């Protein structure tokens, strides 16, 4: 391990920079810096040499040229173990730079601004920063590169423990992280520029949704014991810039390690439960809701959701969109086995009760509004990319196509079952009343079969469908689904319409005295 004697610090994100530089100074490290970073360190009393003074060449072109100088890059790239390199560096007065601390212009924050122009974006494309990062990362055997200010405390501790030196392992890991950092940065720039319309030269270009070259970066959270099945290998990655309220922000409070299927099902449950404004409970099995309810409190919501399908709920994922108390957890543990319990927060009593079931995974997930910008699905040799299905409707968006108008209670129930249907695998049929699902038919190849399954689920649960409402995620291709629904005593249906036989379906509703409303929005889910 070679001792660090000279460092270059040039940061956009300056969190922890002063404290880190103070540690370097105590270890006798000479510090070079630029612009705002140099001023920050100098104002804090840290001895610092401006890069312009070090190179003898001023910053120029509005700061575009600061560190692009042989004295900087020679000091970073020069190999200390090659006599020819050492001789050339001595000949040209180039000193070693042993540590580089650089992060890049905030391109992501810039293009996220609603009024960002192409000129704004271009001016926030870092040139000197990535060049230094890549130079240092390439020469990792002799130079350490830090691109993440969150690493400062660990690096400082290692330097202090080793009299100013870093291990080969640390330098190599920092190098890998640095190359990932620049790859992600360049990918982001590529996504932005290739999303622009072709009228760049004729005015301000418009940004399209989908870039012509799609780049994404992911950070590994954990290796998994296995994938969807034991013979498959798997790992879990999170987005570099995850949407607010995403599952990837979870904090596991207890229980066994999450499995591949746990995470997939937990995501389905979380996306569904956070779509409700009222206190809600969603129970998921194999990525499908098997019980959903909204109520005045979490205990009541759970009881109603569980009552939909007590058999399928066994071994399920249970999600809430409110803080969960001890009474609710006790009811759950008395009723059933579960794999995952998740909510924005748990009371101390709730956690104490859950602890008795030590294998149950308990997750806290921040309840924040947000959605992934894109949904991704791999196909052979390709990738399907779409915007997420976050469409929400209100009563004003709906059109009544039947002779009978829905009652006030039916309007509320129709909106509830429609929202649930959005999270059920197609073909999806959902029956419900009073903020509780009464039967869910999922994933069937024919819509009428899903309808029959939903009816059977309600019958098995002992739930009376008279006066309930029904939702279909897509249009009814024939009237048979409406006829089956009518046989159950259901009095209101919500669906998108759009079939060649819509009028036949509307007429069937009138024959049965059913109120029918259409959304003009489909919610296929595959």
Swiss-Prot record:
Lineage, top-rank taxon, reads Bacteria
Q: What is its EC number?
A: 2.1.2.3, 3.5.4.10
In what pathway does it function? Purine metabolism; IMP biosynthesis via de novo pathway; 5-formamido-1-(5-phospho-D-ribosyl)imidazole-4-carboxamide from 5-amino-1-(5-phospho-D-ribosyl)imidazole-4-carboxamide (10-formyl THF route): step 1/1; Purine metabolism; IMP biosynthesis via de novo pathway; IMP from 5-formamido-1-(5-phospho-D-ribosyl)imidazole-4-carboxamide: step 1/1
Known catalytic reactions: (6R)-10-formyltetrahydrofolate + 5-amino-1-(5-phospho-beta-D-ribosyl)imidazole-4-carboxamide = 5-formamido-1-(5-phospho-D-ribosyl)imidazole-4-carboxamide + (6S)-5,6,7,8-tetrahydrofolate; IMP + H2O = 5-formamido-1-(5-phospho-D-ribosyl)imidazole-4-carboxamide
Pfam short name (any one): MGS
The GO biological-process annotations, alphabetized, read as: 'de novo' IMP biosynthetic process
Sample GO molecular function, one term: phosphoribosylaminoimidazolecarboxamide formyltransferase activity
GO CC terms in record = cytosol
Q: Which family does it belong to?
A: Belongs to the PurH family.
Entry-linked HAMAP family: PurH
The protein's name: Bifunctional purine biosynthesis protein PurH
Q: Which organism is it from?
A: Neisseria meningitidis serogroup C (strain 053442)
